[in-house]
Each structure stands twice: as C-alpha cells, then as structure tokens.
Amino acid sequence: MMSARSVSPKVLLDISYKPTLPNIMELQNNVIKLIQVEQQAYMQSGYQLQHQQQHLHSHQHHQQHHQQQHAQYAPLPSEYAAYGITELEDTDYNIPSNEVLSTSSNQSAQSTSLELNNNNTSSNTNSSGNNPSGFDGQASSGSSWNEHGKRARSSGDYDCQTGGSLVMQPEHKKLIHQQQQQQQQHQQQIYVDYLPTTVDEVASAQSCPGVQSTCTSPQSHFDFPDEELPEHKAQVFLPLYNNQQQQSQQLQQQQPHQQSHAQMHFQNAYRQSFEGYEPANSLNGSAYSSSDRDDMEYARHNALSSVSDLNGGVMSPACLADDGSAGSLLDGSDAGGKAFRKPRRRLKRKPSKTEETDEFSNQRVMANVRERQRTQSLNDAFKSLQQIIPTLPSDKLSKIQTLKLATRYIDFLCRMLSSSDISLLKALEAQGSPSAYGSASSLLSAAANGAEADLKCLRKANGAPIIPPEKLSYLFGVWRMEGDAQHQKA
C-alpha cells in the first residue's frame, strides 16, 4: 500500500569552506544519493509494519539508542564503498564532519543511513558468529557487523521495491516522527523569519510581550495598486497562503485565515464578474467621445480599487451591501459610472475652411475698393480747391499747405468786403495796369484814407460792386506777399 509521501527535505550546501570544486561536487552527489534512499524508505514504509516488531527484547532498544549516538558522525569509508565510491580523499580542512551541511537536513540524511543500517532483511545471517557479543540481538534478526561496529551493507539495503516492504522497528518510527517534526519546525521558522515586521506587529509585541505576533494575512499589511499587479493576484498569493495556513494548523490547531481567505475568494469572483460585465450603453459606439470613455474607465478603476482595498481585514463600505451579492455591487458601480458620464452636446455646424477664406477675401476686396474711392474723391477736392485759390507759379503745395492757403484766402475775401478795401479797388482802377507789385503798400495805405466816403459814393452811384476774378487773384497775391514779409520781420 502506497502511503502519502511527506515533503522532501531541502538540502542547502555550505560551500564557504570548500576551496576546490571536485570535492564539493563529490559531497553533493553523496548527499543526493542519501536523499533518494530516504525518499524510497518513506514511500515503502506503512502503518501496518508498526505491530510486527513489538515482540523484540528490551535490550535491543538500548542497542539502537547506542547506535543513534554513533550515527551523528560522518559515514565511514566502508559506507562510501557500499555506494560504489572506491576512492575517497581524506582532505582535512579543519571542519568537523557534522558541519558539512549547514541545515537540519544533515541530521535527516545521517539518520536515514542509520535507518537503512537497522532495516535490513535477513540476507546476511551467516556472518552472525563473527560479531561481538554485544550485538547478539541484532544478529538474531539477520544483521552482520564489521570491525568498526557498523553493519555491512548488501544489495537488499537498496532494493526497496522487491521483497515486500522494509522491516521498521518502533524506535525507527519514533525517529522518523522526530525528523518530520524537526523539518516542519525548520520550515516554519524559515518562513516566519523572512516575514517582514510591520508597525502593527511591533505595537502588538510591545503591548503583549508574552504573545508572539504573526502575519496572518499577506494582504492586510501590503496594499498594491491595481496597475502593478495582474488581474489574478488572488491566485498569485493563494499557494503560499495555503501552505502557511496548513503549517499554523499543525502547530497551533487554529484557523485564523478562513475569514481573509473568504474575502479574497469573494474579491476574485467579483473582479471576474465585473470584468465580464459591460454597461447598457456600450462605449465602443460613436455616441460617446473620448472624454466619456476616460470617465468610464476612471469609474471602473475606482470601483475595483474600493473592492481590493482591505483596511485591517475588513472590506470597504462600498462592498458591504445588504445581501452581499455581486449584483448589488455591479449596480453601485453602474450608478457611479453614470455619475461620471457627461451629457451629449450638440455643437453648431462650423463652415468649411474654403467658405471662410472666400468670405474673408470678398470683404478685403470691398474694403480696398472703398478706400480707393475715398482717396480719389479727396484728391479731386484738393485739386478743385487749388484751382479756386490764387497761387503763384512757384507754389508746390501739399494738402496741408493747400488748406492753410485756403483759410488765408477766405480771410482776404472777408476784408475785401469791408469798407476799407473798396478804396483799394478804386486806386487800382485809377492806375490802369497792375504791373508794379512794389506800389502795393502805398496803394493799401491810400485806400485807408477816405475809404468810407468812397464806399458810400460807390454804393449810391453803381449799387453793389462787381469784382472780376482776375482782380481778386491779383489783390490776393499782393496781400499774401505783404503778409509773408511782415511775418519774416517779426
């Protein structure tokens, strides 16, 4: 009957004291062979063999206890010969033989060799007469001993598959049970030592120094974001978490992880159901813009993060509904997604670029036409004004100079209509020819004398005076030059 095989021991080699590689490889091969034989012994051992060796004498137990003390040392060269190794270097690096292996697997491997020495079938019964008297109990059971106090090995020690199962005595059963407990304690100690110490554990250790705090939940102290871990992070932590739970049940007979395990299982189921869930209005259609999709993604991440956030082993209030079903959670997440959903906006139709350019070009053309018309009309007005105002042949007037000259001409006409300027006209008619510009000053001074009397006589005789334009232009030129001369003297 095949029994359940225990966890194979893990052997760690301490190679810090070994400077040469061949010795290390040779020692490693020996350890591997010992482990393989130990595994076969575990597989072939059964619980029905426990009742077959109860009739042995009490001095055999004392003899086996004496052999257990001798088995703590390294195997002898004769035992290496049983494995087929004929040459063994006796190199001494000042290291005890029991320190070759750095972990508890060394004792396990050596105790296995002790079990094989004591579990031999009746194949060497002929050599029982050569054994010392102290080993008669073992000789009666079919074992042979050499000169070093060790039993000589035969092919029956390693043929674990034929001839039934190995004969194991009750003392061997106790030794195997002790080895299993040592291995479990060693593995539990390694796992606990490498667990990180958190602030909560330190605080609980200070408040309760007699109670040793352990990390009951790998997710209660470490909150990883959704972007860094994959979707199946519950399956990632599950094997390690189950292993720790089994070991703690064997040592403490407690079940502290059932609540957190149920929460992780519910979280995984909710994540898978939410990933497969699609809202009523699909975001893949053209009815929504890119900003709407971003808002829905943000709402989905918030819903998932609220589920994955565990505060001291208690789920967030968003996940604690009345019935605790996934449907209520999905309804809440859908409502949160609708809250972030923006209403549709209908924008006015914008004209194309070609229409905008055509309209702009038409406006520019019309503005240019109006500007040209305004400039042309202004130029025509200045030309007509220059024709009306008496000018000299040497005048090259700008628009501003033309306007100033026009104001002076208007002032001259106002003075001509007064009483004093009428006498000037009479003096000009008396002279007959307007050839001398130098006598203009004398004429103006003479006109000042008796202007009023002359004006009255002229009005009575002829009525309103009629002055031809040529005479006005001549008089304006004389008056203009006289004004410029006075301005320069001043």
From Swiss-Prot:
Annotated region described as Disordered, given as residue ranges: 48-72, 96-165, 244-264, 330-361
Phenotype caused by lack of the gene: Embryos fail to form the ventral furrow at gastrulation and lack mesoderm and all internal organs.
Basic residues biased stretches: 54-68, 339-351
One Gene Ontology cellular component annotation held by this UniProt entry: cytoplasm
Tissue: Expressed in embryonic abdomen; a single cell ventrally, pairs of cells laterally and three cells dorsally in each hemisegment. In the thorax, there are patches of cells associated with the imaginal disks. During larval development, cells proliferate and, in the abdomen, they form ventral, lateral and dorsal clusters, which are the precursors of the adult abdominal muscles. In the thorax, they form populations of cells in the imaginal disks that correspond to the adepithelial cells.
Residues modified to Phosphoserine: S325, S328
InterPro entries: bHLH_dom, E-box_TF_Regulators, HLH_DNA-bd_sf, Twist-rel_bHLH
Assigned keywords, A-Z: Developmental protein, Differentiation, DNA-binding, Nucleus, Phosphoprotein, Transcription, Transcription regulation
Keyword Transport set for record: no
Subcellular location, record wording: Nucleus
GO biological process, one term: mesodermal cell fate specification
GO molecular function terms attached to this record: DNA binding; DNA-binding transcription factor activity, RNA polymerase II-specific; protein heterodimerization activity; protein homodimerization activity; RNA polymerase II transcription regulatory region sequence-specific DNA binding
Compositionally biased tracts (Low complexity): 102-134, 244-263
Ranges for domain bHLH: 362-413
Top-level lineage group: Eukaryota
PANTHER family: BASIC HELIX-LOOP-HELIX TRANSCRIPTION FACTOR, TWIST, PROTEIN TWIST
Task performed by this protein: Involved in the establishment and dorsoventral patterning of germ layers in the embryo.
Subunit-structure text: Efficient DNA binding requires dimerization with another bHLH protein. Homodimer. Interacts with akirin.
Protein name as catalogued: Protein twist
Upper lineage: Eukaryota, Metazoa, Ecdysozoa, Arthropoda, Hexapoda
